A protein has these predicted regions:
Chain C
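Cofactor-binding beta-sheet edge motifs in enzyme active sites
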Residues: 1-334
Length: 421, 154, 334
């Protein structure tokens, strides 16, 4: 196949507008008669709440204060509808949205937020996913904190370990981190010339945002229009709803353009985080370094909301073996609610965490066997035709060995010697 | 309210500003120069970088009234589609732009560096842009772009 | 004392929504004034380069320069749903939808050209460089611009759809084909650990990334540099400092991400092994480019100082503490 455009270093199409500062991000849009919005967020991680907006409403310049009572369908969420647009009875994390003030300017918004009275009746919170899995733990939603349990059962791990010459067992812990994209969330909503609720934002999936807005406001999707401005980075942090429904609701009710710009601090509260995982690994190999068995238990803290927890922990589970053929595999991965910030999508989506475990396990097995880390990988790695732990055949485009060999060559790693690297 | 006069991108302005107004707000909201970006509001990310009297400043940390009598360059004044600056061109050619949010500040930090030191080493380039955060590029292509621009500008 | 260590990390990554969930991308292609071609698609440019790569796929399929393609992906009023810009799925999934839409568009153009050129069939017609012509008698030719003028303005369009193939896993055994395609990579690093301060400095890195086929090598390199930096921050210093549900490091003066002083020029190797179901063989690499870096760093730290770090992040304090504990244990054994 002769290719003329594919494979060429075509200059980025959006580069010129970005180097000249002309590229518009959501906060760069201004409209005639525009007013501002700001979100009141929970200051405590777990509490029943009572909200009184009456004093704030009397402040000069306050146009409206929205709470759960103003939302026709107060639910959203990428997989489970476990987020509330505004918390109605209970807050489940610090930063949960409680109310949305619309006022003539930003200073008035700030003043109004200070004058909304929130009565918190605090309840015991749970911040450790292992504690949260226990029957007597405080419940974040419903009657169990376990959101999801994924299993792989392949072969017989007991038999695999029995036949193993070396076994390595460890527990690994990864932490919660933020996408830290450079552009904090912002948006502008208005009613367009055809009467559509229009929201300018920076989002990874405009059609999803449209669906959630239509669902929350109980209106038809074609009455909602999403305009995606330039986006200042995302990395998974712009998949869940943040300010989209607040903006749409305000423009819909007030029929005036409404603008919101989050500060960096609010951005940290508003979007998801990377799931912290606790990964208990047991890996066995024969005396030639062939992997025989893997048993892994992976517990993911999804914080106060599920977001993509099911899909993330599924991805952790599927990738738990690393890119290696293992005949006997037992994996259990769990997603668990706590009162921590909510975790969702972030670059690698559960598959970024598991190599922290499986790649160190490989080096430890090699060391025990007196083998170098490259050789043990070469003996076990996926090749064309390999079968994964879920029974999937990798029929084509599996150039892992080439990747490894080229790195080994450039790093000048010793291969076949009884030493590491 | 205070009346201040300043020069922005070669144009003189006399403006009424509130006491608590920051330079970034003046540039973005009074003059419509939205190429000045706000990423952290505490002088850590450098997205709001402008050049003030030849020095790089974080415009979120400068009060508007402090800009009295100063001369300011923002990305809009550096070059546009018809008259692009070699640093901007180098960023395009090398592929130093991804989401673009850090780009204006990054380019201005590079401009201030090259004005003072026309032949910086890689280390000096990295140091000069270390006050400008980028989450997308890992900085390498940005460093290369500045290195290329230096050759063009010499 | 400063100690040098080297380490490696390997990974695989399944792209797309996966697990049998319908993963659909749609695209629309339309003839525009002046013979330009509009591609309308809901695929988002988050900085990764989707706009450029997807335009390249369209330009390749229509055999025309990228300058003559107008890529519209901002407004839900104008664009069909192409799924989320996540799961490293835009190049593969939406790229495929665009390729299909452009192929359908090409066939439509041939059909219209046959009518306007008074030909009996479409066989032998070629679409290239903004015109439709008969390969063996090039005088029979119609430019896109002429075709637009002859049409009732803007009604020449075609759509394309791509639905990815995965198989839902069985609940009790996890047996199934949850993702397709998979992307592979390897990363090697050499670093220096200061055993007194606990600081880790990367001295050298080599990163090989399987891409199926690189649509735009510079953009692939940009992802590799960016993924490397993000992984470096993840493993060595990014920390929300979470206490009882509260994010204590909630600003950039406390939540530290890598600066230009923390990163280094890395040797990037693009490995091509085209995937037959992908647009021109290209697989998604946005997420994979971060994955093998962390474990390579951890293995290198062990190689340098003989201490296994099993908890992230490897902050200087944690590393110094681990070194001290290790020394103590060694002393006790003696």
């Amino acid at each position: 196949m002769k290719l003329e455009v594919v494979g060429k270093n075509i200059l980025r199409i959006d580069a010129l507008s970005k180097v000249t500062g002309r590229a518009l991000y959501p906060e760069d849009f201004y409209m005639e008669g525009m007013v501002y919005g700001k979100t009141l967020r929970s200051k405590v991680p777990h509490a029943y709440i009572k909200v009184d907006t009456s004093r704030a409403e009397k402040i000069d310049g306050v146009i409206k204060i929205f709470t759960h009572k103003d939302v026709p369908n107060n639910k959203h969420g990428v997989v489970f509808k476990d987020h509330e647009v505004f918390c109605s009875e209970k807050v489940r994390r610090i930063g949960d949205p409680i109310a949305f003030v619309v006022a003539k300017d930003r200073k008035t918004c700030e003043l109004a937020l200070e004058n909304i009275l929130v009565e918190y009746e605090e309840i015991e919170g749970v911040f450790d996913p292992i504690e949260a899995m226990k029957d007597d733990a405080p419940k974040v939603h419903g009657d169990s904190n376990i959101v999801y349990h994924f299993k792989i059962r392949k072969g017989d791990v007991e038999e695999g370990f029995k036949n193993s010459h070396v076994i390595v067992e460890n527990t690994y812990k990864t932490h919660m981190v933020d996408h830290a994209f450079l552009q904090p969330e912002a948006g502008l909503s208005f009613i367009d010339e055809e009467g559509r609720i229009t929201v300018i934002v920076a989002t990874q999936y405009p059609h999803y945002d449209r669906e959630e807005i239509a669902s929350a406001l109980k209106i038809a999707e074609d009455k909602v229009r999403l305009i995606n401005a330039n986006i200042g980075g995302a990395f998974g942090g712009r998949e869940d709803i943040s300010l989209q429904i607040h903006l749409a609701l305000a423009a819909h009710e007030l029929k005036m353009p409404v603008k919101v710009v989050y500060s960096r601090e609010e951005s940290f509260l508003a979007h998801s985080k990377r799931h912290p995982l606790i990964m208990k690994y047991k890996t066995g190999a024969d005396k030639d370094g062939k992997l025989l068995a893997l048993e892994a238990e992976i517990i993911g803290d999804t914080g106060a909301y599920a977001s993509w927890a099911t899909n993330v922990l599924r991805k952790s589970g599927v990738h738990a073996t690393g890119p290696y053929f293992i005949p006997n595999v037992k994996v259990d991965s769990y997603a668990v609610y706590t009162n921590n910030p909510y975790a969702g999508a972030m670059r690698g989506f559960g598959a970024t965490q598991v190599p922290i475990a499986h790649e160190q396990q490989m080096d430890m097995l090699a060391e025990k066997l007196g083998m170098d880390p490259i050789t043990i990988r070469l003996k076990n790695m996926f090749k064309k035709g390999s079968v994964t732990a879920t029974g999937q055949v990798l029929t084509e485009s599996v150039p892992l060995q080439e990747c490894l060999e080229r790195v080994v060559e450039k790093m000048d790693f010793p291969v076949g010697e009884k030493e590491a690297y | 309210m205070k009346k201040i006069s300043l020069n922005v991108n070669g144009k003189d302005h006399i403006l009424e500003v509130e006491e608590d107004m920051r330079l970034i707000d003046l540039l973005r909201e009074k003059l419509g120069l939205t190429g000045v970006k706000e990423g952290c509001s505490e002088g850590e990310c450098g997205a709001c970088t402008v050049i003030m009297d030849g020095e790089v400043v974080n415009s979120c940390l400068v009060m508007a009234f402090q800009a009295e009598g100063s001369s300011i360059l923002t990305i809009e004044g550096l070059g546009d589609e018809e008259n692009i600056h070699p640093i901007q061109q180098a960023f395009i050619d090398v592929g130093a732009v991804q989401c673009g949010y850090c780009t204006p500040g990054m380019i201005l930090a590079a401009k201030a560096l090259l004005d003072k030191n026309p032949n910086p080493t890689e280390e000096e380039i990295r140091e000069a842009i270390s006050g400008n955060l980028c989450r997308c590029t890992g900085y390498n292509k940005i460093v290369q772009a500045i290195d290329r621009a230096k050759e063009v500008l010499r | 004392m400063k100690k040098i260590g080297r380490g490696i990390g390997l990974s695989f990554y399944g792209t797309g929504y996966g697990n049998g969930f319908p993963d659909v991308s749609k695209a629309r292609v339309r003839l525009l004034e002046g013979g330009k071609v509009g591609i309308y698609v809901g695929g988002t440019e988050v900085g990764q380069g989707a706009k450029t790569v997807l335009t390249q796929i369209g330009a390749e399929t229509l055999k025309m320069p990228v300058e003559d393609i107008v890529f519209v992906h901002e407004d839900t009023v104008h664009m069909p749903d192409a799924g989320t810009a996540a799961a490293s799925r835009q190049t593969y999934n939406t790229g495929n939808a665009i390729r299909v839409a452009c192929e359908n568009f090409r066939n439509k153009l041939k059909e219209l050209a046959r009518e306007h050129l008074a030909l009996n069939s479409i066989y032998g017609l070629k679409v290239e460089n903004g015109k439709i012509y008969l390969d063996f008698f090039p005088q029979k030719s119609l430019s896109f611009e002429e075709l637009f003028e002859k049409s009732s303005k803007g009604d020449i369009e075609a759509e394309g759809e791509f639905v990815a193939q995965t198989v839902m896993m069985e609940e009790e055994t996890g047996q199934g084909a949850p993702y397709w395609p998979y992307t592979f990579n390897a990363c090697g690093v050499e670093l220096e650990v200061d055993t007194l301060t606990g600081l880790v400095e990367i001295r050298k890195a080599v990163f090989a990334q399987d891409v199926g086929r690189a649509i735009n090598p510079h953009l692939v390199e940009g992802q590799m540099d960016g993924g490397f930096a993000m992984a470096l921050g993840y493993v060595l210093f990014e920390d929300l400092n979470l206490k009882e549900g509260k994010i204590n490091n909630n600003k950039f003066s406390k939540y530290l991400i890598p600066t230009a002083m923390d990163t280094l020029e890395i040797e990037k190797i693009i490995v091509e092994d085209p995937e037959s179901t992908a647009p021109y063989g290209a697989k998604g690499i946005g997420e994979p480019t971060m994955i093998p870096v962390g474990p390579a760093i951890l293995n290198a730290i062990y190689d340098a100082i003989g201490v296994r770090i099993t908890e992230l992040p490897v902050t200087p304090e944690r590393l110094v503490k681990a070194i001290q504990e290790h020394e103590k244990e060694k002393g006790e054994v003696k």
